[in-house]
Amino acid sequence: MKIILSPAKKMIVDTDNLAPVELPVYIDKTAEVLNWMKSKSKEELKAIWKCNDKIAEQNFNRLENMDLYNRLTPAVLAYEGIAFQYMAPSVFEIQQFEYLQKHLRILSAFYGILKPMDGVTPYRLEMQAKVGIGDAKNLYEYWGELLYRSVIDDSRIIINLASKEYSKCIEKYLTPQDRYITIVFCELSGDKLVTKGTYAKMARGEMVRFIAENNIENPVEIQKFDRLGYSFRSDLSSDSEYVFERKIK
């Protein structure tokens, strides 16, 4: 069983705590992406990044001095977005790190796919960015089937906790033999169940923690998730979609 998760824009360098275990599997392709980005002007990159001048300047300077092989941070500690804050890997015990290293995969526009303990450096790049490298018209084409092939294992079970922007990288290549379960977090708004971005990100991180703490190998066990006010809605769920509703007090 593999769990897929989106990355986060906000990243840090932390070389004082855990050391990375290895380099990302597609580091050579990452080097190609880096070279392509370095060939662009500051204005071109600002358009790709869709950010203000200050953030563009910070990331342009990062690119100029980027080293893919030294001063690296384990991926699961490098990302600082909401999902990763609620996952709270900095307080994991060794058994949880070992579980995640085996089961969690972080999808990345820059690195392709990451194990939690792969060494990374801060970058800014989203999968839907207008980036054409070689014959590939965009990053979905650039990474192609590689990410799916890296995620699928003998169980053929994938738990999707990624956003649509990233899960698309996997869904295109699914086969009838695969069991792909998308997790939906929602709450009642008026008379409709809706997904609210911030709460969904919180829940994704919390669910990764729940799965790791309970050493889950069978997807059915995920239905027991009951944190942050969420509970499983069996009446709205199916074999390919688990729906969790947050009760608002």
Task: Mark where each language-model region is.
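Short hydrophobic beta-strand segments
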Residues: 2-6, 157-160
